[in-house]
Each structure stands twice: as structure tokens, then as C-alpha cells.
């Protein structure tokens, strides 16, 4: 999985109004939605270095820390633009759990059209609780969206791929059938939050965020930042089934939300497409 938490930057589900989940902004950093990079994830961040503040940028804490290993490579990517079209310099840093900056790489943003920028970071240290830091070094403005830090070493070497050791363990089991993505996760707490497979294919950056089924199941056990980015979706599951040599068994919504949580039902006429050939 991606090591960055909330890589969509500002795209949050409506029950969680906090736009910087997983992030610590510093300096002049705001959430914007004018002329977005992705129509289904329309929010992005604008970072402004006005020349007076020492720093302007963001830190990402990952999932209780970003786990990195010495000598391993990690692919950083970001979609960025400069509203005034002037070349801007971003520094990408890996910071260890002692707040020491042990790796720094610079990339240049130029042009007022969205573009994907990438860099491979080779970690010089091992730490279970590292952080990713992005700084705007040049005076000016940069818009950023979908910031990602992904291990280069994945199953079959695929970008946005699976953890190699876990996928290998599945392969070694020699399964005949692979069922995905699960059971209750399909239902959702409501029809609005049910798992809709069409949202889990296509460009990863434009797969809409969805609430997780167990986000608010119990009032005394609420996890307001527990969401599905759908970075692992039907496309990746079918690829894995093919790699495993297993028969894929996809689970789809039958038009019922979790009947323990709600009594919502999709009208029968809306389900005709499930049974009729196209």
C-alpha cells in the first residue's frame, strides 16, 4: 500500500471535515478546488512561500509512522503546477523519528498545467516511524495533489502493486478461488457508502474516496479517518487472481445496505443491468 496517509490531499468524506488528516501543514497552506487535477477528487493544496516565512510545506506521518528500510527504494510522485508559471523548487525529505533530515531530493515544478513529477528515494536508514516532508524552497506558489510514496519493490514489480511478501505467501498457498473484496464491506453503512466496483477501476488518482464500513458502526468506537481510497480495487484484485492462477470470485452489491445499520434498498428497476446482458 501507499506509505502516505490521505494522499488525496483535502479529499475527505463528509463525516470528516478535517482536510489535513495525516498531514501537518506549516506556513501558508490552504485547500483549494478551482480547476482541479481530478474531477472525482477535486480538492488539492496550495502552498505559498511569501519570502517572509522560513518554511512552507507539509509533513506526512503515514500510518503511525512511515516504515522505511536502509537501502530500499521508494517512488515519490506528486501532481503539481505553478499558477504564475514560474519555475519552482520543491525539496522532498525523509525525516527519521528523531526529527533528523537524512535524505533530501529536489524537483522542479514549472508551468501552470497539472503535471506528474516523480523521484526515487533510496533510504539511508531504517526506521518504523519516519515522516515525509515536502518544502517549497522558492518564493512563489505551488499547487499539489495526490502525493504518494510507494515501495519500488512490489509483487511483480508493478507500480501501485502489492506487498511482495504477502502476495508471495498467497501464491504459495496455491488457491483455486480468490474472493474479493470481502463481505460486509460491500454493503456499506448506507447505500451511499456501499462498495461500488466501478469506482475502484481506472486511474488510481481519480478513484473517489469512500467511508469504510466500520467507520462509525459503534458510537463509542468511532474512527473518523477510517476510509477507503480504493487504491486496491477490482483491477488489482483481478490482476492478483491471474497471478495466483486462481478463479476470481468478485462480490458485488445486490442493492441492500447493511440491514443492521439501515433499511435502504435500491429500487428493483435500478438493478436490471445486473441480470441483463449488455
Question: How would you label these PLM feature ranges?
Answer:
Residues 31-43, 186-232, 261-271, 275:
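Aromatic- and acidic-residue-enriched carbohydrate-binding clefts of CAZyme catalytic domains
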Residues 97-127:
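Extracellular carbohydrate recognition and processing domains
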Residues 176-180, 248-252:
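Structural recognition of the beta-strand scaffold that forms the well-ordered cores
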Residues 7, 11-45:
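Extracellular glycan-recognition surfaces and repeat-rich motifs
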Residues 117-149:
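Extracellular beta-strand ligand-recognition surfaces/modules
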Amino acid at each position: 500500500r501507499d506509505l502516505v496517509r490521505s494522499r488525496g490531499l483535502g479529499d475527505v468524506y463528509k463525516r470528516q471535515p478535517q482536510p489535513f488528516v495525516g498531514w501537518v501543514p506549516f506556513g501558508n497552506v490552504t485547500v483549494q478546488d478551482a480547476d482541479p487535477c481530478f474531477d472525482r477528487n477535486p480538492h488539492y493544496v496550495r502552498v505559498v512561500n511569501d519570502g517572509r516565512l522560513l518554511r512552507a510545506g507539509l509533513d506526512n506521518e503515514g500510518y503511525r509512522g512511515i516504515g522505511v528500510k536502509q537501502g530500499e527504494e521508494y517512488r515519490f510522485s506528486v501532481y503539481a503546477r505553478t499558477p504564475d508559471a514560474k519555475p519552482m523548487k520543491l525539496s522532498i525529505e525523509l525525516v527519521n523519528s528523531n526529527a533528523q533530515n537524512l535524505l533530501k531530493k529536489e524537483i522542479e515544478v514549472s508551468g501552470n498545467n497539472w503535471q506528474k513529477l516523480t523521484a526515487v528515494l533510496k533510504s539511508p536508514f531504517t526506521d518504523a516511524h519516519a515522516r515525509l516532508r515536502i518544502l517549497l524552497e522558492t518564493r512563489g506558489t505551488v499547487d499539489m495533489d495526490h502525493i504518494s510514496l510507494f515501495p519500488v519493490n512490489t509483487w511483480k514489480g508493478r507500480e501501485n502493486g502489492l506487498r511482495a511478501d504477502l502476495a508471495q505467501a498467497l501464491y504459495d498457498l496455491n488457491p483455486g478461488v480468490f474472493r474479493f473484496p470481502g463481505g460486509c464491506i460491500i454493503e456499506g453503512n448506507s447505500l451511499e457508502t456501499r462498495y461500488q466496483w466501478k469506482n475502484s477501476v481506472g486511474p488510481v488518482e481519480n478513484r473517489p474516496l469512500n467511508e469504510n464500513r466500520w467507520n462509525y458502526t459503534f458510537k463509542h468506537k468511532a474512527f473518523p479517518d477510517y476510509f477507503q481510497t480504493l487504491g486496491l480495487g477490482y483491477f488489482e484484485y483481478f490482476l492478483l487472481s491471474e497471478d495466483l492462477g486462481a478463479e476470481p470470485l468478485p462480490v458485488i452489491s445486490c442493492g441492500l445496505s447493511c440491514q443492521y445499520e439501515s433499511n435502504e434498498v435500491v429500487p428493483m428497476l435500478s438493478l436490471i443491468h445486473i441480470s441483463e446482458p449488455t
